[in-house]
């Protein structure tokens, strides 16, 4: 309904688009969207995607792109310039969100911070699952198990998230970053530099 109030006549969401993130099709319908096929979604004048063409210039979705279409999402144009080139060759306009500067003014469009935050969190959970011991120190009748020791290299958004998650799981955390200014952020999360 909010988009309809802005004059956007119709919002089509590809069936299953939000399933991996825990958003069923009904959640989009409840907000006024229509559920459709990939063809229905790509028929729009404005297409948004988390990963445009899955960063693959050979994606079958490329055949659905048409001249004048505007595509907004993450396309990795610096790492995979062939995707941007393929879209340009089709006459489409690409707004690659990972190139939006991280400024206060553009903060509402900052997709990298949220993605990096999740990546740091998930990295620790995957490491905790693979580690043959538990993260926190445990004292049992059989003895005491020392806490896991975690080294986080890099204290950007993902690194800070990894530090915070490791600490919450009970690990002893050390971090390294090339910026001296990161020292205070790392220490505020309870890690050593």
Predicted regions and their residues:
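Glycine-rich phosphate/diphosphate-binding loop of Rossmann-like nucleotide-binding domains
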Residues: 1-23, 133-193
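An N-terminal-biased, well-structured beta-alpha scaffold segment characteristic
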Residues: 1-86, 90
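Conserved active-site and cofactor/substrate-binding residues in soluble primary-metabolism enzymes
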Residues: 23, 42, 66, 78, ...
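Short secondary-structure transition/capping segments
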Residues: 23-26, 48-50, 106-110, 186-188
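Glycine/serine-rich phosphate-binding loop and adjoining beta1-alpha1 elements at the start
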Residues: 55-149
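Short, hinge-like loop/turn segments at secondary-structure boundaries
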Residues: 28-32, 112-115, 190-193
């Amino acid at each position: 309904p909010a988009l309809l109030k802005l004059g956007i006549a119709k919002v089509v969401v590809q069936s299953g688009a939000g399933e991996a993130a825990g958003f069923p099709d009904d959640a989009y319908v409840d907000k006024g969207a229509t559920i459709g096929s990939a063809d229905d979604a790509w028929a729009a004048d404005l297409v948004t995607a988390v990963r445009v063409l899955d960063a693959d210039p050979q994606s079958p979705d490329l055949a659905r792109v048409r001249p004048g279409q505007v595509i907004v999402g993450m396309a990795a144009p610096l790492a995979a310039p062939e995707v941007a080139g393929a879209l340009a060759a089709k006459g489409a306009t690409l707004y690659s969100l990972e190139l939006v500067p991280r400024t206060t003014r553009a903060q509402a469009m900052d997709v990298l911070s949220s993605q990096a935050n999740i990546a740091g969190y998930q990295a620790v959970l995957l490491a905790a699952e693979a580690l043959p011991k538990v993260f926190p120190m445990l004292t049992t009748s059989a003895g005491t198990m020392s806490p896991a020791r975690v080294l986080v290299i890099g204290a950007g958004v993902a690194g800070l998230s990894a530090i915070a998650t490791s600490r919450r799981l009970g690990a002893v955390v050390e971090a390294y970053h090339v910026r001296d200014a990161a020292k205070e952020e790392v220490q505020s999360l309870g890690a050593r530099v």
